[in-house]
Swiss-Prot record:
Its EC number is 4.1.1.23. InterPro entries: Aldolase_TIM, OMPdecase_AS, OMPdecase_type-2, OMPdeCOase_dom, RibuloseP-bd_barrel. The active site is at 86 (proton donor). The gene is pyrF. It is an enzyme of class 4 (lyase). It holds the Pfam family OMPdecase. GO terms for molecular function: orotidine-5'-phosphate decarboxylase activity. It comes from Thermus thermophilus (strain ATCC BAA-163 / DSM 7039 / HB27). GO terms for biological process: 'de novo' pyrimidine nucleobase biosynthetic process; 'de novo' UMP biosynthetic process. Belongs to the OMP decarboxylase family. Type 2 subfamily. The lineage of its organism: Bacteria, Thermotogati, Deinococcota, Deinococci, Thermales. This is Orotidine 5'-phosphate decarboxylase. It catalyses: orotidine 5'-phosphate + H(+) = UMP + CO2. Pathway: Pyrimidine metabolism; UMP biosynthesis via de novo pathway; UMP from orotate: step 2/2.
Length: 257
């Protein structure tokens, strides 16, 4: 499996953010069963499954084991995996993070934090290149306070656009065909930012969180992956397989028509 294959699939990404309080007296068992059923039902309609690492880490060792089980099951279903951990560190620590996710699961992707600089990102880029994976660098995130740093004007241009231009240059060496293995996270809640990043980084896959519960609206364009977590995993605020299928169909219709 090569992660870039996700870009030829339907553009919807299922965000898996399990909350044990919504899963009854045996939450781990119910999370496992519900997620496997949901993945199997939605797989043909998805580009990838995105696992938010914090929600599994919060469940302790059993949660980490469940993460690996669900990620492995996704791959067996032919569904690419995104590990949403926003990792970032220097040197050997970045290399260790890359081994933990990109090399342990070849063909998968990882979200990373650029605050430490491009040199701290290169171990992730190199691991993705070796393993057929991908990297999504935080650029313009979907949260309301993202502008505190990301919108700071530097030489008349917001910081996130400086980052986008630098990543497009760096990503050229990791490009295969029309797409680079170096992508970016840009919130669907900021459609103007999506357009500005795409203009400056035409070869970068863009992971767009915020569709659904956060109010981000569907956008058109190639190389866009729209992540929906609460709207798909917990439609109506609770586990509901039938409602999740209906929500996926509605989102896909809005995305592709």
């Amino acid at each position: 499996m090569d992660f870039l294959e996700a870009l030829s699939r339907p553009p919807l990404v299922l965000g898996v953010d399990p909350r044990p309080t919504l899963h009854g007296p045996e939450p781990l068992a119910h999370i496992r069963r519900y997620t496997l059923e949901l993945l199997e039902a939605l797989a043909p309609r998805l580009a990838a499954a995105k696992f938010q690492l914090a929600f599994f880490e919060a469940l302790g060792p059993e949660g980490t084991a469940l993460l690996w089980e669900l990620a492995s099951a996704s791959r067996v279903m032919g569904l690419p995996v995104i590990f949403d951990g926003k990792r970032g560190d220097i040197g050997s620590t970045a290399e260790a993070y890359a081994r933990a996710y990109l090399e342990a699961f070849p063909g998968s992707a990882l979200t990373v934090n650029p605050y430490l600089g491009l040199d701290a990102l290169k171990p992730f880029f190199q691991a993705a290149s070796r393993t057929g994976g991908g990297v999504f660098v935080l650029a313009k995130t979907s949260n309301p306070g993202s502008g505190f740093l990301q919108d700071l004007l530097v030489e008349g241009k917001p910081l996130y656009l400086h980052l986008a231009e630098a990543l497009e240059r760096e990503g050229e060496r990791y490009r295969e065909g029309p797409w680079s293995r170096v992508g970016m996270v840009v919130g669907a809640t900021y459609p103007e930012a999506v357009a500005r990043v795409r203009e400056r980084a035409p070869h970068a896959p863009l992971l767009l969180p915020g569709v659904g519960a956060q109010g981000g609206r569907p956008l058109k364009g190639e190389g866009l992956l729209f992540a929906a977590s609460r709207a798909l995993y917990y439609p109506g605020g609770r586990p509901d397989l039938k409602a999740a299928l209906e929500a996926a169909e509605a989102l896909l219709k809005a995305l592709v028509e």
